């Protein structure tokens, strides 16, 4: 963490290079430094469960089939994803001792508030900014037990049992949030090298994928005598690199798959809402985005996946469940050209 002196220097430098007035009091600069620290603490606790969940949402449902397909076969899928929100990640506790400028308005020393994937409960935090009182309503969660969103996927079969995979979701508006994912990958059939497996309709495949997840949530709408602070939209940006192994067994028109998934995700956070009126005085959104780099993180996940795929002529219906820390399900209707 930056020292108090370093925080004030950062704010001062930003003021100088942005061409803004530098007539603000030392008290204002100190209070803004404290407010930035408080916002940073709350941001981490609030959005991290949602970005963890986004990894699960994007990680499952990549593999249609583990078997080797014919050259230039094309499959297009329309998918509906179901993410089951766990109780353990819906809320977190805050204490007055967690904050430097703010405190719980009710007079309590601690309170429980929702994460981004929690309920719609809210409390008020209060403090003084350069001697002027401010009052902040904590952000709501999405207040859903199951998060449902659609996405498209596709696969193109190339030479030697290799396929190119793609996944794309337009920006989907969920309750008080937005979600978007895109990604691509390569799958290679391994059972082609073991004739005994092919003879028994047992298939093996290895897959490597990359996906980008972007989740955004309504955040803190803070009104002050200096204008709106412009931190009312918080985004989590996640890059996920994934490897998985799948095995399947064919039973006439049914293919049953089981898989093991391992991935590494890089998490970044950014304020993406409209800049507030305070930007005429201090480039607060820029300063906060620089400070948000302090909570960037990298995490590894391991999960299992089971899937069933049923063929009706050129149409396939597939249901997939991935499980680990979270549970995520995907229902896909595919057409094979």
Question: What residue spans do the PLM features occupy?
Answer:
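Outer-membrane beta-barrel biogenesis signature
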Residues: 23-124, 199
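Residues that define the transmembrane beta-barrel architecture of outer-membrane proteins
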Residues: 70-72, 145-150, 178-184, 200, ...
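Short loop/turn motifs that connect adjacent beta-strands in outer-membrane beta-barrel proteins
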Residues: 64-72, 87, 176, 191-204, ...
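Bacterial Sec-dependent N-terminal signal peptides
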Residues: 1-28
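Residues on the lipid-exposed face of transmembrane beta-strands in outer-membrane beta-barrel proteins
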Residues: 65-67, 76-78, 152-158, 184-190, ...
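Repeated loop/turn-to-beta-strand initiation elements of outer-membrane beta-barrel proteins
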Residues: 160-164, 193-196, 253-256, 312-319, ...
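Extracellular/periplasm-exposed beta-strand and loop segments of Gram-negative cell-envelope proteins
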Residues: 89-91, 128-144, 173-179, 212-240, ...
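Transmembrane beta-strands of outer-membrane beta-barrel pores
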Residues: 80-84, 168-172, 190, 208-214, ...
